[in-house]
Swiss-Prot record:
This is Solute carrier organic anion transporter family member 6A1. One of its GO terms (biological process) is sodium-independent organic anion transport. Strongly expressed in testis. Weakly expressed in spleen, brain, fetal brain and placenta. Detected in lung tumors. Keywords: Cell membrane, Disulfide bond, Glycoprotein, Membrane, Transmembrane, Transmembrane helix, Transport. It comes from Homo sapiens (Human). Residues 1-46 are annotated as: Disordered.
Length: 719
């Protein structure tokens, strides 16, 4: 709730109280004229004593407050706006005229967007690396849930309180967010900087040998795991608290300082920069995705610093995000809670929006828990707000599903390496979503859409993205022949079993997945399962020879005359549908992003202006409960059902899925996203008809007016 401008009723008491100040104001010019005729008593070269004692900034600040006080003492006419609450730009009492040129929403957006990018980078780094961290240290189920859900749970717990109590002092909360984002980044980076633990790793020979020595299960990185996990969860929790002022109070602050139909552009820019930051973190973290490598001998290796090499580069990225976030501390603290012109904008918006009960127009709430509960009860009785919040939650499920499952889908469907698949997913997902958010905000602002038009826009764009989503299911590749999975070792083995008579004496392990492609165009899980007994490097790549399971295919000799049986990597799927898939998924993400800003704008227009921040807080709690908390788990569980072969290492830990059923994976991914988009359309349709019915019942209160004559004519015909 923000402290709005006091409304003047124009009563006789107020007029009588304003007589004396008015008479004094009229008498002032005559007094000034008499003063001009009298000679000055002070010497020409003598300076005022205050100029010698006080800084210039303090005098200007004091004069500013006196002028505002004198101006507010004169009663206003009913049609006039009291702008005495507007404040100058400065750091506390230090006010400078050169700072006033930055006292506008455009300059605020620069530092606000920088802060959004910093938190987006942290999110991207965490999401792209969390899978490798879980695999590296064999986390338990409860540890995985704590690691994945700490951000969502912490943000959901504080969202309503920050929205209610932070609405009066938004700038202070922005500064707190800047500090907490940097602190959370350092908490994620701190353990990997000072870690000195040594962790034993299992070295496994990847070629066929009858005698192998495999050790290392007794030693584990428990010290590093518990220490890093606690700091990582704490960092995620701090990030969750830091994000709520940005995504709740930041939206209302922008909405209060721009015209009604300009808010879409600013919110679109904010959403776009947030996703750009996430993409930046995704791209920075993608090259650090750990890829299993082949070893050439059975050894027990030791890794210093208690962690994989990629963690060292990882903490540098977190440190960079923390430094940039803290650089916005002082600039953000200089902005006032009420910018110049904000009072007139608020007064203009009060005249436009009256969908809600007229008794709530001049709602006044305190700061105790009873007032918070009363405000929450008012919002919970608003079915339009609840439906729009549910629509936002289901819409986010599509983005969550794409970010969680798309890298795995690309890797397995189009035979890509984990690094390439993750990088490509980031380059498709984030620009598509960011462009959709930006274009959605620009379109609704350019067309100056009313609240009803916003809901229609959400429904239309969701239907288009739904149609594009259906086409994705037809863009998939045929599975490659894989020994032991869909090929039975030329009739000597069984489907579903990697071991066959040709490799049963090799003592192969499925804990390390290092696929090779034989000259028979069949893919093998590892050189050991192909029965290869010899390997040597050719052009910085390892080639394999004397493979007992590979009996057919074109024979190729190397420079030394030895016949090559297999080469590292996956076999060519002879599938060239990747560009078509990228085009469809990119278009789907753009049209899905179109609805992001309109949903937020619609929610702010169906509640009283003093409850806008709290309404966004309620929507974020609903988003967490029905969207971001269960969403990743739903997609992961669906992906697990399409798993064919899973990693179970010698130490008994169950790891990632190595091989998926491509057809089942495609149907599951598209099916869940289709259901989410359908729910978005249903909830928005319900909100639209409830809004339309309420609007027809309250004919005294028109919808948001528009300036464009064409749009105005169209809205009148719709009513």
């Amino acid at each position: 709730m923000f402290v709005g401008v006091a409304r003047h009723s124009g009563s006789q008491d107020e007029v009588s109280r304003g007589v004396e100040p008015l008479e004094a104001a009229r008498a002032q010019p005559a007094k000034d004229r008499r003063a001009k005729g009298t000679p000055k008593s002070s010497k020409p070269g003598k300076k005022h004593r205050y100029l010698r004692l006080l800084p210039e900034a303090l005098i200007r600040f004091g004069g500013f407050r006196k002028r505002k006080k004198a101006k507010s003492s004169v009663s206003k006419k009913p049609g006039e706006v009291d702008d005495s609450l507007e404040q100058p730009c400065g750091l506390g009492c230090l006010v400078s005229t050169c700072c006033e040129c930055c006292n506008n929403i455009r300059c605020f957006m620069i530092f606000y967007c920088i802060l959004l990018i910093c938190q987006g980078v942290v999110f991207g780094l965490i999401d792209v690396s969390i899978g490798d961290f879980q695999k590296e240290y064999q986390l338990k189920t409860i540890e995985k849930l704590a690691l994945e859900k700490s951000y969502d749970i912490s943000s959901g717990l504080v969202a309503i309180f920050i929205a209610f109590y932070g609405d009066r002092k938004k700038v202070i909360w922005f500064v707190a967010s800047s500090f907490l984002i940097g602190l959370g980044s350092l908490l994620c980076a701190f353990p990997s900087i000072n870690e000195e633990n040594k962790q034993s790793k299992v070295g496994i020979e990847d070629i066929c040998e009858e005698i192998k020595v495999v050790s290392g299960c007794q030693s584990s990185g428990i010290s590093f795991q518990s220490k890093y996990l606690s700091f990582f969860i704490l960092g995620q929790t701090v990030q969750g608290i830091a994000g709520m002022p940005l995504y709740i109070l930041g939206i209302t602050f922008i909405d209060e300082n721009v015209a009604t139909h300009s808010a879409g552009i600013y919110l679109g820019i904010a959403e776009c920069t947030s996703m750009i930051g996430y993409a930046l973190g995704y791209v920075l973290g993608a090259p650090l995705v750990k890829v299993p490598e082949n070893t050439t001998s059975a050894t027990n290796t030791t890794v210093n610093n208690g962690s994989p090499e990629w963690l060292w580069t990882w903490w540098i990225n977190f440190l960079f995000a923390a430094v940039v976030a803290w650089c916005t501390l002082i600039p953000l603290s200089c902005f006032p809670n009420n910018m110049p012109g904000s009072t007139r904008i608020k007064a203009r918006k009060r005249k436009q929006l009256h969908f809600f009960d007229s008794r709530l127009k001049d709602l006044k709430l305190g700061t105790n828990i009873k007032d918070l509960c009363a405000a929450l009860w008012i919002l919970m009785k608003n079915p339009v707000l609840i439906c729009l919040a549910l629509s936002k939650a289901t819409e986010y499920l599509v983005i969550i599903g794409a970010s969680e499952f798309l890298p795995i889908y690309l890797e397995n469907q189009f035979i890509l390496t984990p690094t390439v698949a993750t990088t490509l997913a980031g380059l498709v997902l984030i620009p598509g979503g960011a462009l959709g958010q930006l274009l959605g905000g620009v379109i609704v602002s350019t067309l100056e859409m009313s609240c009803k038009a916003l809901m229609r826009f959400i429904m239309v764009t969701s239907v288009i993205s739904l149609i594009l989503l259906v086409f994705i299911i037809f863009v998939r590749c045929n599975p490659v022949q894989f020994a032991g999975i869909n090929e039975d070792y030329d009739g000597t083995g069984k489907l579903g079993n990697l071991t066959a008579p040709c490799n049963e004496k090799c003592r192969c392990s499925s804990s390390i997945y290092s696929s090779i492609c034989g000259r028979d165009d069949i893919e093998y899980f590892s050189p050991c399962f192909a029965g290869c007994t010899y390997s040597k490097a050719q052009n910085q790549k390892k080639m394999y020879y004397n493979c007992s399971c590979i009996k057919e295919g074109l024979i190729t000799a190397d420079a030394e005359g030895d016949f090559i049986d297999a080469r590292p990597g996956k076999c060519d799927a002879k599938c060239y549908k990747l560009p078509l898939f990228i085009a469809f998924i990119f278009s789907t993400l753009i049209f899905s992003g179109f609805s992001g800003v309109p949903i937020v704008l619609a929610m702010t227009r169906v509640v009283p202006d003093k409850l806008r921040s709290l309404a966004l807080g309620v929507s974020y709690v609903i988003l967490r409960i029905f969207g971001t908390i269960p969403g990743p788990s739903i997609f992961k569980m669906s992906g697990e059902t399409s798993c064919i072969l899973r990693d179970v290492n010698k130490c008994g830990h169950t790891g990632r899925c190595w091989i998926y059923n491509k057809t089942k994976m495609a149907f599951l991914l598209v099916g869940i996203c289709f259901l989410c988009k359908l729910c978005t359309i249903i909830f928005t349709t319900i909100a639209f008809f409830i809004y339309k019915r309420r609007l027809n019942e309250n004919t005294d209160f028109p919808d948001v007016t528009v300036k464009n004559p064409k749009v105005k004519k169209k809205e009148e015909t719709d009513l």
